[in-house]
Amino acid sequence: GGCHAQMYTMGTLLRHGSDEQKAKWLPKIASGELRLQAFGVTEPTSGTDTTSLKTFAKKDANGDYVVNGQKIWTSRAEYSDLMILLARTTPKDQVTKKTEGLSVFLVDMREARGHGLEIRPIRTMMNHATTEVFFTDMKVPKENLIGEEGKGFRYILSGMNAERILIASECVGDAKWFIAKASAYAKDRAVFGRPIGQNQGIQFPIAKAYANMRAAELMVKEATRKYEAGMDCGAEANMAKMLAADASFEAANACIQTHGGFGFAEEYDVERKFRETRLYQVAPISTNLILSHLAEHVLGMPRSY
């Protein structure tokens, strides 16, 4: 998780930060001296309806910003030195389009902890460090505004596309693990005097999971190609995430079914990975929202939400 987080959060700064910001922060992030792991976007009342977020950054007399609000499902905040934060800087009722009036900040969490920043861990069913984050009159220097004030939604989208591509890559890796684990067990486990992998009822789910994993992997590569070339890759990033998440969970189901009762035993690791890969049916974007995006923005259908 830490590796992919560093890549997609850093992309927002890399693509939209000023020369001064890049010179100050990027070398230390690249060397590992500073950890940029936290991406503060989701809120308890907004979820994927990002433009309805309530965290507000107000300018003070010196032109610096004072932030109040709350984020949730902010992964790795406990282990991060810096945070990419999306906050509203113009009230929603004062903008023409709801995507306007949102700004992105780089928060130095080392300075902010105990000075308006509070982090509360959330326990989950899997090995994933995630938190609630509270901002109470937290100050952010004006030089930590990334890009132009009010244009942050556009900046954050590029980070979200990178996140979806990276999560998709992880899901492909998970699917490969499940398929390899299931195949090895099916060849080794003998029942009624022969390997269970000799039965088509065992073979077919694993083989189908493999085919779907390979198809998802190709979409991940296409999304990556377009992202690296600076092309519009929203549809491809979303499709890669959806297909890879589905392939991973399909492979997880096949793997746990192949192992039978042993699939639920901790020593085989299957149940742990099964719980972990279930997350990606929901995060960082749900399958239904991806389908709505494709229907509207690719197929030209009316907006459904």
Labelled PLM ranges:
Residues 111-139:
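Flexible, small-/acidic-enriched active-site or ligand-binding loops
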Residues 1-3, 8, 16-21, 32, ...:
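Alpha-helical interface subdomain recognition
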Residues 64, 68-116:
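A short core secondary-structure module
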Residues 15-17, 58, 85-89, 106-108, ...:
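Short beta-strand-to-turn element immediately C-terminal to the catalytic PLP-Schiff-base lysine
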Residues 32-41, 86:
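A short, Trp-centered hydrophobic/proline-enriched beta-strand micro-motif
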Residues 45-48, 73-76, 95-96, 122-129:
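Short Gly/Pro-enriched turn/cap motifs at secondary-structure boundaries
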Residues 137-154:
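Long, acidic (Asp/Glu-rich), low-complexity accessory segments flanking structured domains
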Residues 52-56, 72:
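Beta-sandwich/jelly-roll carbohydrate-recognition scaffolds of carbohydrate-active enzymes
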